[in-house]
């Protein structure tokens, strides 16, 4: 089930997302968050976390850094610095226009 859900999100990323203007207020994007949540927490909890993230992503929130936490929660990651890996830091640095390498 986890693989099917991941495949659906990747299909969205590849075929639908490029047709829409960028709108995600968070890093990583909501679709990437969903895939990471599925991988880390399984189909049910990962789906719930991804849906909660999509509902949080709206014009009334500041957005910002919100990686998938190591524990299950439907709220924003309270300690994003603890759940970053090197690729997240490099991607964020590149997105912000800094040097990376």
From Swiss-Prot:
The record's InterPro entries line, in alphabetical order, gives:
Membr_insert_effic_factor_YidD (IPR002696)
Q: Give the UniProt entry's GO cellular component terms.
A: plasma membrane
Q: Which SMART domains match?
A: Haemolytic
Q: Which UniProt keywords apply?
A: Cell membrane, Membrane
Pfam families cross-referenced by the UniProt entry? YidD
| Compartments, as annotated in UniProt | Cell membrane
Task: Give the membrane topology.
Answer: Peripheral membrane protein
Note the HAMAP family from the entry. Answer: UPF0161_YidD
Q: What family does this belong to? A: Belongs to the UPF0161 family.
Purpose: Could be involved in insertion of integral membrane proteins into the membrane.
Q: What is this protein called?
A: Putative membrane protein insertion efficiency factor
